[in-house]
């Protein structure tokens, strides 16, 4: 089974998110969405999220956009979810440059057998 992982805030689920998640899901057998915790949204976007992380997680699951959705680590760049799910592939959004670099550095440092791929914009 090929597990695919994606990361995001998903604060106000919209058609761009839906496209991204469907595209990621098509790349494997099992899609796990890692929803940024509220504190991370505050740090990344310099504002409070519109909806708490549990509501954002539930929205993804209620639309059947993923096989599982989890709340990300409170500690930035801990990547505990990688050990938990052992993805073969991580899909990166068109606007996730900082995430792509941080993940690439971690994967290289830890010598993990994970491929990163950037998905197109809608």
Regions found by a protein language model. Name each.
Residues 1-122:
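Nucleotidyltransferase catalytic core that binds NTPs
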């Amino acid at each position: 089974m090929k597990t695919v992982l994606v990361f995001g805030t998903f604060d106000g689920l919209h058609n761009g998110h839906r496209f991204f998640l469907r595209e990621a899901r098509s790349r494997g057998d099992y899609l796990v969405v890692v929803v940024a915790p509220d504190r991370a949204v505050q740090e990344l976007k310099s504002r409070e999220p519109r909806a708490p992380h549990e509501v954002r997680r539930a929205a993804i699951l209620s639309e059947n956009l993923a096989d599982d959705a989890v709340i990300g680590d409170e500690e930035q760049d801990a990547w505990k979810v990688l050990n938990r799910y052992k993805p073969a592939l991580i899909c990166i959004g068109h606007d996730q440059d900082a995430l792509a670099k941080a993940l690439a550095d971690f994967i290289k440092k830890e010598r993990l057998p994970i491929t990163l791929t950037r998905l197109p914009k809608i």
